[in-house]
Amino acid sequence: VLIGKRKNGRYIVADVINKRLSSADVREIIKQTCITDKAKYKRVATRLPQDPGQAGKDQAQSFLKLLAGFTVKCIPESGDKVTRAEPFSAQWLGLEGMDKGNVDVLIAPWNEMYFNQLESFPESKFKDMVDASSSAFIEIESGNTYSAPPTDGGLNKESYWRK
C-alpha cells in the first residue's frame, strides 16, 4: 500500500498491490514496486514487516540486500492487527458527525477489493491490505523523515542522515 501525506494534512492512498504469490514472486514484485515508485515519486520509504525470531531476522537481511539503493526498513510488528489499525482507522473515519475522514483514495481498479477488506475488518478472513495500510500510515507519522541529499555538492552526516 502506497500512502502519502499532502501539504494540507490529508492522506492519499495512491496504490495497492494485493496478490497471492510464491516467495520468489513476492520478492520480485516488491523490488519492481520499489523501482517504479522511486522513478515516479522520487523519495519513497519502504516499510516491511519483520516476523519474530531468527527466521524473521534472516528474511529482513535478505530484503535489505535485495533492495540495496532504496530506503527500506524491516520493522518487527507488535500488538494485534486491530490495535495497529486504530490510528489509520481514526483518520479514515474522521470525527464523529463528520461526513468523511482525512484519507483520500485514487480511483483505480483495486478500489472495490480494498474498500471491501477495510469495511469487513476485523471479521474478514483476509487482513493484509488493512495491515499494510496501518503500517504505511505509522511510517508516515513516525517522524522518521529523511532529508534529500544537498544539491550544493556538500554531503555530511548532519545534512543527509538526519532522522
Which role does the model predict for each range below?
Residues 137-163:
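Acidic two-metal-ion nuclease catalytic site recognized across multiple nuclease folds
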Residues 2-124:
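Mg2+-dependent endonuclease catalytic cores in nucleic-acid-processing enzymes, primarily RNase H-like
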Residues 86, 133-137:
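Residues within alpha-helical segments
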Residues 129-131:
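Conserved RecA-like P-loop NTPase helicase motor core
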